[in-house]
């Protein structure tokens, strides 16, 4: 999610009026959701089947991978571009375009693919499920993605706390080497490709691509200034693409079933299937693969068993992980779960980690806790983030008690705007957006709490 820079500053294209004529063009899809089982890419999401090589092959992994590799980088990039796949780590940048930055004449330096498995966003656990239950999808995805970029090797940077997941991944890599699927002459294609696992040490900031690269190199995980971008100077000073686990893992299936198949799901510019995490006040917290642009209400009601106490008991939802602004129940009624629809709703898809809060939630305290997290995880390199997030944390602690004045709400908003967009990476943005969402939708609750505190304070003084 640290890659999700300036999402709220984006704009949607103007609405286009459609005229129906007598041609045979199929009408645009208007309803989304209810993904069929045969269209699911992640078929072992809940670990009900064997995750090792034989089990993975029985579910279609490593099928005709040699043919995909032999078709070459241009063909793979063409299918990924046709699919409309956008980065699944939060930023939503077109994957085919990003990968094509690496597909240029070599200057003698090796190229690398780095997979960001440092999943530290509160509420997010989709990549963990892929690595734990479907590790071969990721390993095969590294090979296919690496071939598209002309990469020599892939480094999978995995969160240090994911001990069991790292173990499963290492087993899957060993099995792939022993079967000749990766390494020298991978899959018999004549293409050499290695895969390495690098364990992180728990720093959230290493989810930012350049901080992750610094960590791989053995340095302190602090974001780099850009340019130069990783595609020019990345890990070990070589051209590098950093990609999310889910983004990489879906690429072999896109190549096998065709980019047009993947593009048939979701709205235009928001195509494909997506893993959604649903947690919080729901009857059945889960991770589920669903079509992009599925209505948020349907996602919660159908897959998570609904809000505890019923839909009318819903207070607010954080739709894309802790760094995206919350939206109230009134917006949740109709909003679609895709990049553009959520930007229009003044929030973002982020990592698609849906955090549901019912009416029992102290919404001010919940957001204050998130700000405390970002204050703790700031690397301290940028002054607006280091000082501003610490200041916001102190103010939010007083807002929880109500020990503040209404004018301070505007001050907090202004500080959040001064942090947003003024830092090297997007951690400052991720800390500012939850505060902005709270003020935008729950300002009356903040003012009421301050009023109650003032009345109680006056009553105590009168008692003396």
UniProtKB/Swiss-Prot annotation:
It is found in: Mitochondrion inner membrane. GO terms for molecular function: 4 iron, 4 sulfur cluster binding; FMN binding; metal ion binding; NAD binding; NADH dehydrogenase (ubiquinone) activity. The modification Omega-N-methylarginine is found at residue 257. Pfam families: Complex1_51K (PF01512), NADH_4Fe-4S (PF10589), SLBB_2 (PF22461). Binds 1 FMN. One of its GO terms (biological process) is mitochondrial electron transport, NADH to ubiquinone. Keywords: 4Fe-4S, Acetylation, Electron transport, Flavoprotein, FMN, Iron, Iron-sulfur, Membrane, Metal-binding, Methylation, Mitochondrion, Mitochondrion inner membrane, NAD, Oxidoreductase, Respiratory chain, Transit peptide, Translocase, Transport, Ubiquinone. One of its GO terms (cellular component) is mitochondrial inner membrane. The keyword Cell cycle does not apply. Its EC number is 7.1.1.2. Its cofactor is FMN; [4Fe-4S] cluster. It catalyses: a ubiquinone + NADH + 5 H(+)(in) = a ubiquinol + NAD(+) + 4 H(+)(out). [4Fe-4S] cluster binds at residues 379, 382, 385, 425. NADH binds at residues 87-96. It is a peripheral membrane protein. It is an enzyme of class 7 (translocase). The keyword Signal does not apply. It comes from the Eukaryota. The modification N6-succinyllysine is found at residue 81. Residues 1-20 form a transit peptide. PANTHER family: NADH DEHYDROGENASE [UBIQUINONE] FLAVOPROTEIN 1, MITOCHONDRIAL (PTHR11780:SF10), NADH-UBIQUINONE OXIDOREDUCTASE FLAVOPROTEIN 1 NDUFV1 (PTHR11780). Belongs to the complex I 51 kDa subunit family. Core subunit of the mitochondrial membrane respiratory chain NADH dehydrogenase (Complex I) which catalyzes electron transfer from NADH through the respiratory chain, using ubiquinone as an electron acceptor. Part of the peripheral arm of the enzyme, where the electrons from NADH are accepted by flavin mononucleotide (FMN) and then passed along a chain of iron-sulfur clusters by electron tunnelling to the final acceptor ubiquinone. Contains FMN, which is the initial electron acceptor. This is NADH dehydrogenase [ubiquinone] flavoprotein 1, mitochondrial. The gene is NDUFV1.
